[in-house]
């Protein structure tokens, strides 16, 4: 059990113990190696995309690739907030995290995660303008406007993370301190609160639901218009290139949003599949982003070849 501090009112939790993901003991070493390799590949893959964007003047001046570079930066940080603790889950050591560390992790997890939600929406809007309004695209979406929109996404994400962290840790925690999860996240932490959590669960449902649902609906609306525009393209090659560009984004969005909706719109429930679902958008998605966008994007591949060729 973690440390507690006696007060005149009750015992106050000063740290939490992360129980991690359920796994067979005989697979501990293998899982440690797998997640460690995934983490290293995630960092290297996203760093490679960032360096490619910065090294190629043609790419770093275009909104589509500015957004892709920001996504890679977010993926690196989101992965660093969650995966190292998940890796420790497969070691014999006790996975204790200080109370303040738990607060910080929950804040950054939701800050970065919600910022990523907003960024996916901006990426869909950018593709909508590029395909549906090609002649007006340079006016409607330029580097300066893209920078302002990205800054707005960061501010909105920070506000979302602050709201969730404040609401979660304003509650008293005076009893059990074992978090049945691999990170400090809202549903798992709320189960340990020494107070009624109905209001928190409702706010989580509404707040996360509004952010996720509104972003997802805007993305679907953008792609409905995009598909309609693509079907009007007369050349087969033109349709193929447009679908290829948009297909990468749709794959990433699906892998990210479906697990989020599964977990946070059921905040009061306890499902053993929650941990597996969370692995998708905390571990798998940051790894897939550089692979999908690199392998399916001819311009990125060409830029990589130019850089590696010197």
Curated annotation (Swiss-Prot):
Q: Which GO terms describe its biological process?
A: detection of chemical stimulus involved in sensory perception of smell
- Briefly, what is this protein's role? Odorant receptor.
Descriptive protein name: Olfactory receptor 10G2
- InterPro entries recorded for this chain? GPCR_Rhodpsn, GPCR_Rhodpsn_7TM, Olfact_rcpt
**Molecular-function GO term, any one:** olfactory receptor activity
Matches recorded under SUPFAM superfamilies: Family A G protein-coupled receptor-like
The record's Gene Ontology cellular component field reads: plasma membrane
Disulphide bonds in the chain: 102-194
Which domain of life, per UniProt?
Answer: Eukaryota
What residues bear carbohydrate chains? 6
Checking Gene3D superfamilies in the record gives: Rhodopsin 7-helix transmembrane proteins
Q: Which residues lie on this side of the membrane: Cytoplasmic?
A: 51-58, 126-144, 223-242, 296-310
Chief location category: membrane
- Which residues are on the Extracellular side of the membrane? 1-29, 81-104, 166-202, 264-274
Family indicated by similarity: Belongs to the G-protein coupled receptor 1 family.
User: What subcellular locations does the record give?
Assistant: Cell membrane
Question: Which is a Pfam family this sequence falls into?
Answer: 7tm_4
| Spans traversing the lipid bilayer | 30-50, 59-80, 105-125, 145-165, 203-222, 243-263, 275-295
Instruction: Indicate how the chain sits in the lipid bilayer.
Output: Multi-pass membrane protein
Give UniProt keywords alphabetically: Cell membrane, Disulfide bond, G-protein coupled receptor, Glycoprotein, Membrane, Olfaction, Receptor, Sensory transduction, Transducer, Transmembrane, Transmembrane helix
